[in-house]
């Protein structure tokens, strides 16, 4: 079962990061990382071809109020995002009547393998479980995206099931659905 999300007035902080709602002024930073070949593709979407495309998606992030911008404290640069999406997968009866959401995330290629996404997702998990009182979170990663799966494993997500995902750029990817319960 999904719960309503509105992060428009939420600001989360970690040692290196600020997680906050997107702003129109983030457009240049967003386009900078979203236009790099291979970044969006690891999350199921094609890299952006124009600033106008990034602007449309940025407006959607702002309107939907469920996607955090990941901001580096040291320079206030937006380097990625984490969405708290509605669960889109068929889950078993044990989860049917519980409150849950699906996490999706992407990070600028310049910041891969620095522990940043683990730090950011950890803070969002804390928010989802302590503030939103969710019972569980799920996340999906393509089987070839070992780094993304490793982030989830470090944060105690457990294998739930193998699935197939059709991406927005019309490929079919073998994927793993991971589950984290709020105990």
Regions found by a protein language model. Give the residues of each.
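Acyl-donor (CoA/ACP) binding surface of acyl/acetyltransferases
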Residues: 1-40, 67, 71-183
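A short helix-loop-beta-strand connector motif used in the catalytic cores of GNAT acetyltransferases and
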Residues: 58-69
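Conserved GNAT-fold acetyl-CoA-binding loop/helix
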Residues: 38-59
């Amino acid at each position: 079962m999904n719960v309503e999300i509105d992060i428009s007035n939420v600001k989360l902080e970690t040692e290196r990061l600020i997680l906050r709602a997107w702003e129109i002024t983030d457009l240049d930073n967003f386009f900078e990382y979203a236009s790099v070949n291979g970044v969006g593709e690891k999350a199921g979407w094609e890299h952006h071809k124009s600033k106008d495309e990034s602007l449309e998606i940025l407006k959607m992030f702002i309107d939907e109020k469920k996607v955090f911008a990941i901001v580096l404290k040291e320079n206030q640069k937006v380097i990625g995002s984490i969405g708290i999406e509605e669960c889109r997968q068929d889950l078993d009866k044990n989860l049917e009547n519980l409150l849950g959401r699906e996490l999706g995330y992407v990070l600028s290629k310049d910041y891969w393998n620095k522990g940043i996404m683990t730090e950011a997702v950890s803070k969002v998990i804390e928010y989802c479980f302590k503030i939103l009182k969710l019972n569980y979170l799920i996340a999906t990663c393509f089987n070839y995206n070992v780094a993304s799966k490793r982030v989830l494993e470090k944060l105690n997500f457990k294998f739930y099931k193998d699935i197939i995902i059709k991406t927005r750029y019309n490929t079919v990817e073998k994927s793993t659905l991971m589950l984290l319960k709020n105990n």
